[in-house]
Design a protein with these regions (language model features):
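Helical scaffold of the NTase/Pol beta-like nucleotidyltransferase catalytic core
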Residues: 1-9, 88, 92-98
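Active-site nucleotide-donor binding segment shared across nucleotidyl transfer reactions
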Residues: 1-32
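Glycine-rich nucleotide phosphate-binding loop and flanking beta-alpha elements
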Residues: 16, 36, 76, 95
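Residue-level detector of alpha-helical segments with a strong bias toward transmembrane helices
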Residues: 21-22, 29, 76, 81, ...
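Compositionally biased, low-complexity linear motifs
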Residues: 25-27, 83-88
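Metal-dependent nucleotidyltransferase catalytic core
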Residues: 29-56
């Protein structure tokens, strides 16, 4: 995988980036031509942000080692909205940082 400014890493990878827990896969949001299994399908229901906001507004992403990641706040809000049992655990992990 090479850095691409039109792709944003999301999901549990962000928790791994902060040392909160390991991730098992890499979820992506694509600015152009997203595959059907991308996280673009969850933008309206779980993220409540526009694609343009996530990809282009620095308030909602950060760079690490050349790769673009959604911020921890974006993941926290997404997990609160989705509210699965694993998400509630992850929200507690995120809140333990503050």
């Amino acid at each position: 995988m090479k850095p691409n400014d039109n792709e944003v890493i999301t999901g549990s990878t962000i928790l791994s980036l902060y040392g909160l827990r390991d991730c098992k896969d890499i979820d992506l949001i694509y600015y152009k031509d997203p595959p059907t299994d991308s996280h673009n399908q969850y933008l309206e229901t779980h993220y409540k942000l526009t694609l343009d906001d996530i990809v282009n507004n620095p308030r909602y992403h950060l760079y690490y080692n050349g790769f673009k990641y959604v911020t921890l706040d974006v993941i926290k809000n997404m997990k609160k909205l989705r509210n699965e049992p694993k998400d509630r655990i992850d929200v507690k992990l995120i809140e333990s940082l503050k």
